[in-house]
Amino acid sequence: MSKDATLPVRGTVAELKLEKKLPKKIDAIIVAIFEGEDSIELAGGEILDFIFSTEQQADILTQLEAVGAKATANSITRVPGTDVAPVIAVGLGKADLLDDETLRRASGTAARSLGGFENVATTIGDLGLAAAVTGFGLGSYSYAGLRKETEESKDKTTTVTFISTGKDDKDVFVEAQIIVESVLLARDLVNTPSSHLYPESYSVIASNEASKHGLQTTILDEKQLADQGFGGILAVGNGSSRKPRLLRIDWKPRKAKKSIALVGKGITFDTGGISIKPGASMENMISDMGGSASVLATIIAAARLNLSINVSAFLPMAENMPSGDAFRPGDVITHFGGITSEILNTDAEGRLILADAIAYASEDKPDYLIDAATLTGAQLVALGLRTSGVMGTDEFRDSVAKTGREVGEQAWAMPLPEELDEQVKSPVADLRNVTNSRFAGMSAAGRYLQEFVGADIEWAHVDIAGPAYNTAGEFGYTPKRATGQPVRTFVQVLKDLSES
């Protein structure tokens, strides 16, 4: 058993509550404002009127106009408010352009402005409770890591109360909270340094998290991986003294008719191996297990939401290190299932461990299979820091990409051009792990993985190299470092499949 069997630290987050009336102790009330034709307008309906009288609303608007408040999306303005409490106004832009993502981002921005407040209430849920809860929950996240704590550095938990007037509000609130908590789990895992999160410890931590929710787990160690022929995972992981693992997790509800396999890349640190990466920014490679973290979080959410779909998650875990035991360019490895692959670049290791896990998952003959990976720099070149690339069988690929855009996790469908068929072939093996071309690197990786997907399985490969880890500034409900993408996309895909 690994000594690191639990996460060393978790991020802090606001405590969200749903109440039918305003709490007695309140430090501020967060309201939303729209851009009107000539002036700003308070945004809301029943809940706004429930808390503030017509005269109080007019007074708040007067105060906001007096300080030159703008209602552009994500703007924040503080005013004295009323005798109820001071007011924090967050802008939503024009009312006719409001959508869930605008509301999520504004709520996240508001959540990040609450330093110094212990108890706040908000009327923003009046405009879309699920989106507001998601924005506040994700936006309030802060990760201090392993810094020595002082009284000044202690994060004081803020309580955010949503006022409820609808009969279905509790169900909406609880579901949104579960999804938020799942995203936060993925963030915590990705933010954990590789000194504390490595294949053995990660497999135990993930298994423990899944077991809390009644999920069945199985861990294969390096000996079992060798006995069963997982040549890709072993090739990548054997260069490290921290040996590889493969974790399987199952959610099997009664009467479920459909099945899906989730596969996530779990490289706990990536040096590039013998094809070593440049030293600059290599510390960000703690995030190279982001795909596996999202898969773990998704199957836990499926269990907590009691989704009626059979879900099996596969998390191949390895540390890609250079050593005398590391695999080399020119090696030929044999994947699970027998396909051989020539290694041209040891820094194209993610597809090797995914290939084993996809072939293994395909033996169950699931109806659908999704894999997620921080896989290629080519994704960043093609789509940038915030948009995932989705490849796979046409209809399912398009559906997953569309779902991502709907929940606010930007995604774009990408092709697997037929000319790549010859480029992924090797003269000395069935495949080569990279092509000899610098073009279409993201699609080439997807084309490699396609070889391992079983027949008649609807498949989507999601490259999250940029979106999984935010190296730029925080925005909306997205913090620096781990983002938790694409957990919300995957949970919604599972919900849609379970209900269809």
UniProtKB/Swiss-Prot annotation:
Binding locations of Mn(2+) 2: K265, D270, D288, E349
Molecular function in Gene Ontology: manganese ion binding; metalloaminopeptidase activity
Catalytic site positions: K277, R351
Cofactor(s) the protein requires to work: Mn(2+)
Annotated S-S bridges: none
Keyword annotations of the record: Aminopeptidase, Cytoplasm, Hydrolase, Manganese, Metal-binding, Protease
Note on how the cofactor is bound: Binds 2 manganese ions per subunit.
Localization terms from the record: Cytoplasm
Highest taxon in the source lineage: Bacteria
PROSITE patterns: CYTOSOL_AP
EC numbers on record: 3.4.11.1, 3.4.11.10
Family matches, as InterPro entries: Leucine_aapep/pepB, Macro_dom-like, Peptidase_M17_C, Peptidase_M17_leu_NH2_pept, Peptidase_M17_N
CDD domains: Peptidase_M17 (cd00433)
Residues that coordinate or bind Mn(2+) 1: D270, D347, E349
Cellular compartments per GO CC: cytoplasm
Reactions catalysed: Release of an N-terminal amino acid, Xaa-|-Yaa-, in which Xaa is preferably Leu, but may be other amino acids including Pro although not Arg or Lys, and Yaa may be Pro. Amino acid amides and methyl esters are also readily hydrolyzed, but rates on arylamides are exceedingly low; Release of an N-terminal amino acid, preferentially leucine, but not glutamic or aspartic acids
GO biological process: proteolysis
Family named by the database record: Belongs to the peptidase M17 family.
Function: Presumably involved in the processing and regular turnover of intracellular proteins. Catalyzes the removal of unsubstituted N-terminal amino acids from various peptides.
PANTHER family per UniProt: CYTOSOL AMINOPEPTIDASE (PTHR11963:SF23), LEUCINE AMINOPEPTIDASE-RELATED (PTHR11963)
This protein's name: Probable cytosol aminopeptidase
Source species of the chain: Corynebacterium glutamicum (strain ATCC 13032 / DSM 20300 / JCM 1318 / BCRC 11384 / CCUG 27702 / LMG 3730 / NBRC 12168 / NCIMB 10025 / NRRL B-2784 / 534)
Taxonomic classification: Bacteria, Bacillati, Actinomycetota, Actinomycetes, Mycobacteriales
